[in-house]
Structures are given as structure tokens and as C-alpha cells.
Amino acid sequence: MSRKILLVAACALIDADGRILLAQRPEGKSLAGLWEFPGGKVEPGETPEETLIRELDEELGIQTKEACLAPLTFASHTYETFHLLMPLYVCRRFEGIPHGREGQAIKWVKPNALRDYPMPPADEPLVATLRDLL
């Protein structure tokens, strides 16, 4: 069966204490209540890095630059109606204080506590890679 391929870029924001920022999917969206790495859909003509710069500003009110985004790994996961490809970047340098601009809860989480936050199936395999990095 042929499924649409959806390209989404995600970012593991890491603070000075080595914690990772998670955002909770708001009510009314698919997978509501689950925690995820901030990011969003790559629009036509946009690179994943451009997507993250835009989405981090829109969703969290923070600014970063392409040079501050380091590609780490990616997720490839088949959902019922589409296949998700999601590069995950790490960002340690950004300006501003993250806050949920779209009504979503956010939380800084120690790497060893990431498993305590229910995540979408595509995000779950990324946790081990991040724990190994930090």
C-alpha cells in the first residue's frame, strides 16, 4: 500500500544543565497529550533547518541560527495513513526563554527521565540516542 510521506523536522533543545525540552501535544491535535521534541512540518521549498528556525520561533518564542542546529539522527515510522520521516537536530545555542506560544505545556527533562513522558511512536526510538549523547 502506498502512503504519503510526511517530512517533519524536530529539535532537541538542550539547556546549560543538560536537560532537553519537551512539548506536550495540545488537545484537539492528533496524539494529544503526548510529549514530543519541538518542530514541525517541512513546507515546500523549505529545508529542515529553515523549518526549525521558523517553528522554534512560532511555537516557543526563541531564535536560533542554522549554524547552531546539529543533525543527530532521524526517525522513520509508518502511521496508519502516512509515513513519517523526521530528522532530529540538537540545539544548545538559542536566544530567548522558551514558552508555549500555542497553548502547549513544555518541560525541561533530564535525559534519564525522558522515558517517563509518553511520546508518539516515531519519537520513542530517539530517546536512547539522546541519552547516549548526554
Tell me the role of every PLM-derived stretch.
Residues 1-20, 41:
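Conserved N-terminal beta-strand and adjoining loop/helix that marks the start
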Residues 1-3, 131-134:
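Generic C-terminal helix-cap and adjacent flexible tail
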Residues 6, 15, 73-97, 107:
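Active-site-adjacent beta-strand/loop module that shapes the phosphate/pyrophosphate-binding cleft
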Residues 19-58:
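Conserved Nudix-box catalytic region and its N-terminal flanking loop in Nudix hydrolases
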Residues 63-73:
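A short coil-to-beta-strand element that immediately follows conserved catalytic motifs
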Residues 88-90, 98-130:
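NUDIX/MutT-family hydrolases
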